Amino acid sequence: DFSVVATKMTNESAVGDDIQLIVSQEEVISIKKGSTVTYSQSGTVSVGEEEISHTATEDLYDQIIVPKGKFTRLILADGSSLHINAGTKVVYPKHFAKNKREIFVDGEIFIDVKRDESAPFFVKTAQFEVEVLGTAFNVSAYKGDDYAEVVLLRGAVNLKDNKKNTLKLSPNQLASIS
């Protein structure tokens, strides 16, 4: 189950002050502030211009941990782009399932989701879940905060909190969950 894997992985903490890319729970790669991590549809991973070799398996997840004072960019295999803020952890599969795309976030990201009506995109946090309908938006959901927020830039998203309350956002709207 994705939620169980994501929760387990986000309990791991960063070592030192470097941004860490954890590939398949095995290899830890330190990357420079502002570097872009790119996943291709063929399964290759690159940090900046450097390609990283690893075995791409659908049932394995990678994690990126960005410590305070740092930021990075992540391009997922489907072409969706994430700007990951300081103090953030993101857990995601190397390859998305054919009918569903989902990631887990503890912290803050700005995401521009590649539209694919056959495979909805979900951003899960400890406080809520966002169903993405081909859009760009910001999620701020740090574990220690009393509230979490979603700000929609374009497109549409459906929010569902832990009590199963739902809300649809339109562009330029903000939802705050406490």
Question: In which residue ranges do the predicted regions lie?
Answer:
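Conserved active-site beta-strand-loop modules that form the wall/rim of enzyme catalytic pockets
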Residues: 148
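Short acidic/polar, Gly/Pro-enriched loop/turn segments located at secondary-structure boundaries
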Residues: 1-145, 158-177
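Short, conserved beta-strand element in jelly-roll/cupin
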Residues: 152-156
